[in-house]
Every structure is written in structure tokens, then in C-alpha cells.
Design a protein with these regions (language model features):
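An acidic-aromatic
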Residues: 65-116
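Short, solvent-exposed secondary-structure boundary motifs
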Residues: 44-49, 66-73, 121-130, 144-150, ...
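Gly/Pro-enriched, hydrophobic low-complexity segments
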Residues: 135-242
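Hydrophobic, well-structured mid-protein blocks that either form specific transmembrane helices
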Residues: 106-146
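Short, mixed charged/polar active-site loops
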Residues: 50-54, 75-79, 95-97, 153-155, ...
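Start-of-domain marker
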Residues: 12-86
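C-terminal motif of bacterial Sec signal peptides marking the signal peptidase cleavage site
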Residues: 5-8
């Protein structure tokens, strides 16, 4: 009798975890905004080096990400504007500027990076949209969404109660380089949940082994609005291109 009950429970448990869901079954909460202003504390950590700064971030959804850094030696006076096709950075202390397309950014970080990925990292949305080609299953208190898109594999973890994204793991197939995103401390912004604590880990490999870059972002204030924001950015003629 005990054996039969055990087998019955195991069979029942297996069916719960093996059930698949469609994209229409999930109503994952996405941050809806026209313009967004965020003030954050950031910490950037590489091998043997940690940099801290305060960031003022302004965004126009799906179009512009602008930020200004202050408070730390080496990043004081750094301003950047990110659009769909480029990243522009000026350092007003060193009087230098940098212009990149996303192929160059991806090469620098040894991982495929685009505008949508950066935007999703800041607001806690899925980097790639959900569709019926994705594998969707439920495990414990989370939905597990697996995506296989061109040269990357993505695993998204969504909280069952809040329907908010809490973790993303992205792996580049060819190199095995990986990106991990963790979202915590969700707070209300215009009736929607925004993660105020974000941890980003980027791992790549070279001839010496594994190298990790970490970025921690802690928002202190966030405001969504339908009123246009300013994104001041200009490069003085006397600045040197790098």
C-alpha cells in the first residue's frame, strides 16, 4: 500500500512539473511608461578594481537611455546617451569622448549586447519577448521560461504571485559566455512594480580562465511620466576622440 501511495504521489508530482504552458497563459507584468527618471547608486566591479558612483538615469521607452555619473574618481563628469544603434560617452574631466555601435560594445564586453538588453536590465523586463516557441513550465513558486534564439539561450524565472521577472540567465552558445540578472526589492511606480535592487554578472573566458564583471544597481527614486524629458548631450570641439 505504501509503495502504491508513493508511486501515486511521484506520478502526480511529475505531472505538475512537466505540464507545459503557452505564452497566452502567462500575463507577465511589464513596466509601462513613456518617460522614466531614476536616481541610483551603482557599483562596478572587475578583477582587482571596484568603482562606485551615483547615477541619474533618464529614459524614453524603446528609444533613448541617458545617464550622468557623479561622485567617484574616474567617473566624475561622465555622461552617456544610448540609442537603438549607438552608444556615446563623454568624460568632461578628461575632455574625451567615445563613440560605439553595438557590435563594438559587444566585442568590448565579449557578449552580445543591444539597446533592448540594456533597457530590460534597468526596468526588469524580459530581454526577448515571450512567444509560443518558448518552453514554459511551472516549478515551485516560479514559472521557468526557456528561449532558444539564434546564438543565445535564455532562462527566465517569473514569480508566480507577482508575475514579475526575478532572474534571467543568458548564455552565448558559441563561447559559453554568460549573463546573470537578479531583480529584488520591487516598489510601486505609478501602480507598477519596479525592481529597486539589480545585480548583473557577466562572465567570459580567455586563455587565463574565467573573468567576471559585476554591476550592482540600487535605485533610490523612480518616477514615470508621459511628459517629455530632456536628454542634454553635446561634444565640445576641443574634446579628443578615443
Amino acid at each position: 500500500m505504501s509503495l502504491i501511495m508513493l508511486q501515486s504521489c511521484s506520478s502526480s508530482k511529475l505531472s505538475v512539473f512537466s505540464k507545459s504552458y503557452s505564452a497566452e497563459d502567462l500575463k507577465i507584468e511589464k513596466l509601462d511608461f513613456d518617460y522614466l527618471t531614476i536616481k541610483s547608486k551603482i557599483q562596478f566591479k572587475e578583477t582587482h578594481k571596484t568603482t562606485k558612483a551615483t547615477a541619474l538615469i533618464r529614459m524614453k521607452k524603446d528609444s533613448i537611455i541617458w545617464f550622468n555619473l557623479s561622485g567617484a574618481l574616474g567617473v566624475q563628469g561622465v555622461r552617456a546617451i544610448i540609442t537603438k544603434d549607438s552608444v556615446k560617452i563623454i568624460n568632461r574631466v578628461e575632455k574625451k569622448y567615445y563613440l560605439y555601435d553595438f557590435d563594438e560594445v559587444s566585442k568590448e564586453f565579449k557578449f552580445p549586447i543591444d539597446f533592448n538588453l540594456i533597457q530590460s536590465m534597468i526596468v526588469g523586463d524580459m530581454p526577448k519577448p515571450l512567444d509560443n516557441s518558448n518552453s514554459i513550465k511551472k516549478s515551485g513558486e516560479q514559472y521557468i521560461i526557456k528561449q532558444n534564439i539564434e546564438n543565445i539561450r535564455i532562462t527566465n524565472l517569473v514569480n508566480l504571485q507577482t508575475m514579475k521577472l526575478v532572474e534571467v540567465n543568458v548564455t552565448e552558445k558559441e563561447t559559453d559566455n554568460s549573463l546573470k540578472l537578479l531583480y529584488k526589492d520591487f516598489k510601486d511606480v505609478n501602480g507598477q512594480g519596479l525592481p529597486f535592487s539589480i545585480f548583473i554578472s557577466l562572465i567570459h573566458y580567455n586563455e587565463f580562465g574565467e573573468l567576471e564583471t559585476q554591476l550592482t544597481i540600487n535605485h533610490s527614486r523612480a518616477e514615470a511620466s508621459d511628459k517629455p524629458l530632456r536628454f542634454p548631450f553635446s561634444i565640445p570641439k576641443k574634446y579628443e576622440a578615443q
